[in-house]
């Protein structure tokens, strides 16, 4: 009976050791999990800060690019814009005539007298 009692005491102590070790391991796991959450939150904050910084840098680069573009290619003068507008209007006006000529359905779209008119118009525009 004493051997059973001694064995019971030994098993009880072993049980207490296992339970205390289990509690210690659970506490370590909780601490580790808390540290991981803290680290993850810190990483998330770092990522958000980097994203905002990158977005700001991108906006600055785009603004600098736009500024350089306007320096390299300034807006054309009003006379140039006017000439360009009239040129494209003329192109659109004569496209149907040229289209028929190129398809072989009509003669050459400009006669000699039309060429003289065009030259006179160009000279008049140049004198303005």
Swiss-Prot record:
Pfam families: CEP15-like. GO terms for cellular component: cilium. It comes from the Eukaryota. It is found in: Cell projection, Cilium. Keywords: Cell projection. Its main location: other. May play a role in ciliary assembly. This is Centrosomal protein 15. It comes from Homo sapiens (Human).
